[in-house]
Amino acid sequence: MSLHLSQDFALKASAAVAVLLLAAWVRLRRRIQSKISNIPGPKPTSLLGNYSQLHSAEKGWEFFDEIHAKYGNVCRISTPVGCNDIIYLADPLALNHMNRRDEAKFDDPHEIHIMLQMVLGNKGLGATSGAEHHRQRKFLNPVFGPSYLRHMPPLFYEVTHRFLDAMRILCADGQREIDMSHWGTRVSLEFVGKGAIGFELDSLAIDSKPNLYGEEMKQGFVALSTPAARLAMKYFLPRIASLRTPKFNRWLLNLVPSPLVTIVKNFVWELDANSRTMFQQKKEALLKGGDALSEQSSKGKDLMTALIREHVLVDRADKVDEEEATSHFRTLLFAATDTSSSAILRTIQLLAEHPDVQTRLREEINTAKADADGDLSYEKLLALPLLDAVYRETLRLYPPASYIDRVAHEDVVLPLAFPITGVDGTQMSELVVPKGTVVTMSIVGVNRSTAIWGPDALVWNPDRWLAPLPETVKSSKMPGITSSIMTFLDGKRHCLGYRYVQMELKILISEIVCTLAFAPTEKHAKIEWPMGLTLSPFVDGKMSMPLKVSLA
């Protein structure tokens, strides 16, 4: 009898708890929905709301253009039935407050942390928040600062020269069509290998096979970018991750009969295995010192050597443990490779499309080289105005990441630079963001805003940086760790490697332009850059960017 009563009580108690949780969730959803219901936005097209449009590889850019044309810098995006709608934001003043004054009130959504923990480990920079994230940035900031980066140019030049040796062989008999997507992936991976982690990941020889990790990483990003994957990450992944151990979650993922899951799983496991192996080799070389370090491809000048030397192999209470250091290895490989590949390939494509800029840039760099003894110093590269303009304009118009999600941890009121008209017809000069609301910060939206940049905002025009910028840019209060663009974000979660990317890209482009000439092929009109977590060029559904290449 007592057992029956206890079971009956347990069932009733469980039911009561479930009802209370459901009631709390419904109340929270109604609270959020009611406070943002006056924000205009597109009507949902299905039970998924506008989610499939927002994350569509084929129609994503078209959807972005439509909502900007109709709703401006702020709109409400419908999500799957039963979920809270999100706020799409491209207003510079509101974004300024999100990234600066009110940055403590926002963080990455929970599902982003879960996804990054599965890919990068529980202790990677992208997977942490709060005090732990602040601690990591505090010791990582100097590693990405000028004092360490001054050792990078010789490493970057060495990679660039190997890449150009391959191009000279391929173009020895004259102009030929080359898939630059293939080579862009290889050279960007080797930049990370040489400068960031201190290993040769690709010899860049034309008769050598490319490192499979680069291709797997590209496929992994494409798989993670599909609407189905984004839905799973947002609404399913956090639930299973909170149920059991990581070992159980991996076992559960093995049961999912999906090619996308297989691609991502293989990519993650390859990343984890490579990172652990390379970390141990790096640590052993540091412990041996002397010849062991000089035998490494980077001669011990890479960023991970600095991190291990100063924060792992030390006798301090705040030392970094090996699991965290391995997570930082994975983070560098994961974050840097595809970002730099996207920027490199986009710049090359734009130079092919604008032969006048290509010629002017070649003349600027050759003039600087005439007075130099060997490779240009990084200080001289920084002083080249057109090179800087090409770099800034490319990353303004084509940021590697189109948008970033943040979730409000408390109610926030954000001022608007450009007031909007609510659904009820009232003018709104500020935005009320309820606790728990996801805000999609549109990097591409604010970088391309005609209200800020003028009527030619959608035109690639490096010359805009060679004259005083419009007053609308100066007065916009646009956030950004680099001047006037939001590509590398701002505040506590800005991109730590922005100087690294700038150095890498300027060195590579300066040498490429002096050695090679690029022109479009007959397939050029077919080159597309589908919407995704990061951006890569495709032709007829295959990752590719064919260009005519010849020696300059």
Swiss-Prot record:
Heme binds at residue 495. It comes from the Eukaryota. SUPFAM superfamilies: Cytochrome P450 (SSF48264). Its cofactor is heme. Pathway: Secondary metabolite biosynthesis. Pfam families: p450 (PF00067). InterPro entries: Cyt_P450, Cyt_P450_E_grp-IV, Cyt_P450_sf, Cytochrome_P450_monoxygenase. It is a single-pass membrane protein. Induction: Expression is induced under erinacine P-producing conditions. It is found in: Membrane. Glycans are attached at residues 50, 447. It is an enzyme of class 1 (oxidoreductase). One of its GO terms (cellular component) is membrane. GO terms for molecular function: heme binding; iron ion binding; monooxygenase activity; oxidoreductase activity, acting on paired donors, with incorporation or reduction of molecular oxygen. The chain crosses the membrane at residues 9-26. It catalyses: (-)-cyatha-3,12-diene + reduced [NADPH--hemoprotein reductase] + O2 = erinacol + oxidized [NADPH--hemoprotein reductase] + H2O + H(+). PANTHER family: CYTOCHROME P450, CYTOCHROME P450 12A4, MITOCHONDRIAL-RELATED. Belongs to the cytochrome P450 family. Cytochrome P450 monooxygenase; part of the gene cluster that mediates the biosynthesis of erinacines, cyathane-xylosides that show unique biological activities, including leishmanicidal activity, stimulating activity for nerve growth-factor synthesis, and agonistic activity toward the kappa opioid receptor. Cytochrome P450 monooxygenase; part of the gene cluster that mediates the biosynthesis of erinacines, cyathane-xylosides that show unique biological activities, including leishmanicidal activity, stimulating activity for nerve growth-factor synthesis, and agonistic activity toward the kappa opioid receptor. The geranylgeranyl diphosphate (GGPP) synthase eriE catalyzes the first step in erinacines biosynthesis via conversion of farnesyl pyrophosphate and isopentyl pyrophosphate into geranylgeranyl pyrophosphate (GGPP). This is Cytochrome P450 monooxyhenase eriI. It comes from Hericium erinaceus.
